[in-house]
Amino acid sequence: MVVAILRVVSAIEIPIRLGFSEANWRFSSPKYDNLGRKKSRLSVYSLYTTSKYACVGFEAENNGKFLIRSSLVANPAGEATISSEQKVYDVVLKQAALVKDQTKSSRKSTDVKPDIVLPGTVYLLKDAYDRCGEVCAEYAKTFYLGTLLMTPERRRAIWAIYVWCRRTDELVDGHNASHITPSALDRWEARLEDLFAGRPYDMFDAALSDTVSRFPVDIQPFMDMVEGMRMDLKKSRYKNFDELYLYCYYVAGTVGLMSVPVMGIAPESLAEAESVYNAALALGIANQLTNILRDVGEDARRGRIYLPQDELAEAGLSDEDVFTGKVTDKWRSFMKRQIKRARTFFEQAEKGVTELSQASRWPVWASLLLYRQILDEIEANDYNNFTKRAYVSKVKRLAALPLAYGKSLLIPLSLRPPSLSKA
């Protein structure tokens, strides 16, 4: 039985800002402690001082667990709506449940499922995966090198996911982006449903169709990425971070949810699957926020501003200031706040990377370390992301690889003694 109690509170009643999973408290009920139950966790999500209203939800379960989450927000008209983080959290729970169900139903490796039936010879599927690997090597060299440490089955599955994500992104950000319409995205989504049903259209689809038949991957993150492309077609401003968070989830956070079922959680890990997926989501959010901060000038020249409008206003800035592209003290202050937020998501992500299967950690660590350096470069450019593109030199990129490899060898955070938990 679950009891839900909701009340709307004003932002004045919330003196602190809490990001995604940034704070956890222990709450125990003497009644349930006497029954020998474990003390449960109290989690608080996305309560922003900049929001006019927040709706806090308390849940009490029959095991004595009490949860508080920002599942709803109230708009100025007084209408209650689901917050972006809660929408995403529901997808995380679904994906984590799929993995748990797969683990319970079969202790066998996900790598031993038979190939899907394809027209032609069995070599067609191998060729499809090989071509995916070539695309990954061409456009994501560092990440590709990291995947070479993974098992062949996991490696080629990650390549297939990468290629689908790249093709999807190219629809609205490639050479033919100006010709893409909502109906074209509808057709792409229908094609996605077909490949999940084992009806691929081409060799790249065939690779992904085989991948989703082998691993407990849900279609929802893929559908959500297509939704992110739709958002790009019709939206060029984001009034607050809640809106921007949802966009970041659609176009990048989804990648983490697609990848974890393939990369796998370390058998020895004591972490809950949900926490690992949350961390993967955080890495996607962090990467996209970093992309946004790096490309402010480039996006502005396209008439787009992927920055929270309310936070720009709080800093005394406007769209015109972004289009003018002059670095001022106000801009520096605003950027410091945005960079701090991105780093918070990177910190959240680090906790989950250690829980992945060891062979899968290196490419993820490499991505995390390299993207985080982009934030350092923005600072080194004195926050001029209007005319200077933050670029991590080849020397620094190469230097990050052995560091990433070293981190990939560490035992999962859930197994470390407290004295080593920050290593």
Curated annotation (Swiss-Prot):
Catalytic activity: 2 (2E,6E,10E)-geranylgeranyl diphosphate = 15-cis-phytoene + 2 diphosphate
This protein's record includes keyword Chloroplast: yes
Keywords: Carotenoid biosynthesis, Chloroplast, Isoprene biosynthesis, Plastid, Transferase, Transit peptide
Gene Ontology biological process terms, A to Z: carotenoid biosynthetic process
One annotated Gene Ontology cellular component of this protein: plastoglobule
Extent of the transit peptide: 1-136
The keyword Ligase is annotated on this UniProt entry: no
Compartments in which it is found: Plastid, Chloroplast
PROSITE patterns, A to Z: SQUALEN_PHYTOEN_SYN_1, SQUALEN_PHYTOEN_SYN_2
EC number(s) recorded for this UniProt protein: 2.5.1.32
Pfam name, any one: SQS_PSY
Gene Ontology molecular function, alphabetical: 15-cis-phytoene synthase activity; geranylgeranyl diphosphate synthase activity; squalene synthase [NAD(P)H] activity
Main location: plastid
Subunit structure: Monomer.
Family to which the UniProt record says this protein belongs: Belongs to the phytoene/squalene synthase family.
Protein name: Phytoene synthase, chloroplastic
Annotated source species: Narcissus pseudonarcissus
Gene from which this protein is expressed: PSY
